[in-house]
């Protein structure tokens, strides 16, 4: 179960068009934030809960499930990075955009904006052999049946070997840890009653099965 992961490490600003759409500066080096495992909602285990006074935005991402340990402060070889991945999944990195924007203005960390319960809906585990090249698949997210995000992972600014190398400058990646690799352009708001659907496609736009999942947003009681 993904909810039993030791940690969830996420890279920020890893697609150029997404950086531009939010008028963010381009980072000079990869940077990361953590999401709590309590944010994870697996298929069939509940809805997306939007708290009062929160402007929630969707961000679809390719997720990696670690199989092998990558110890901190040791080089990640060109051969070991792919071997260290056990499987994949599609995740929706929900963000309390108003909370994040306020934190950014004050120069404060914005993990709080990413960490609400249910703010990481995830799809089914995708066996590794179904994705020979994780840099050549298409992320797709639909809101109420309309496609709002659709782009290739080939557009990542920092590819997975660089992501792993940057994370392990500070911390080890252990078996079962999850890594989110960034979101493409097209992010936007979600309100109670909306239905989000996410999936992964091959470069030829064939759906990768299993990858698709659906989740409904509801207001917090």
From Swiss-Prot:
Protein name according to UniProt: Oxaloacetate tautomerase oaa1, mitochondrial
An example of a Gene Ontology cellular component annotation for this protein is: mitochondrion
Keyword Lipoprotein (UniProt): no
- InterPro entries given in the database record: Fumarylacetoacetase-like_C (IPR011234), Fumarylacetoacetase_C_sf (IPR036663)
Name the gene that codes for it. oaa1
Reaction(s) catalyzed by this protein? oxaloacetate = enol-oxaloacetate
The EC class name is: isomerase
Major localisation: mitochondrion
Family according to the record: Belongs to the FAH family.
Q: Where does Mg(2+) bind?
A: 59, 61, 93
Domain of life, per the record? Eukaryota
- Protein location: Mitochondrion; Cytoplasm
Q: Which cysteines are joined by disulfide bonds?
A: none
Question: Which BP terms from GO are recorded?
Answer: oxaloacetate metabolic process; tyrosine catabolic process
């Amino acid at each position: 179960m993904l909810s039993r992961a030791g940690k969830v490490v996420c890279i920020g600003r890893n697609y150029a068009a997404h950086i531009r759409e939010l008028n963010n500066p381009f980072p000079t080096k990869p940077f990361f934030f953590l999401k709590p495992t309590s944010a994870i909602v697996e298929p069939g285990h509940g809805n997306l809960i939007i708290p009062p006074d929160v402007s929630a935005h969707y961000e679809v991402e390719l997720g990696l499930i670690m199989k092998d340990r990558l110890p901190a402060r040791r080089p990640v070889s060109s051969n070991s990075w792919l071997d260290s991945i056990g499987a994949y999944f599609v995740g929706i990195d929900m963000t309390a955009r108003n909370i994040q924007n306020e934190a950014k203005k004050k120069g404060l960390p914005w993990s709080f904006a990413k960490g609400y319960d249910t703010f990481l809906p995830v799809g089914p585990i995708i066996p590794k052999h179904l994705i020979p090249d994780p840099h050549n698949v298409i992320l797709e997210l639909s809101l109420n049946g309309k496609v709002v995000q659709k782009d290739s992972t080939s557009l990542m600014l920092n590819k997975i070997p660089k992501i792993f190398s940057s994370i392990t400058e500070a911390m080890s990646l252990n078996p079962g840890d999850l890594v989110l690799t960034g979101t493409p352009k097209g992010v936007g708001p979600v309100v109670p009653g909306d239905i989000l659907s996410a999936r992964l496609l091959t470069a030829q736009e064939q759906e990768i099965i299993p990858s698709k999942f659906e989740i409904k947003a509801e207001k917090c009681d």
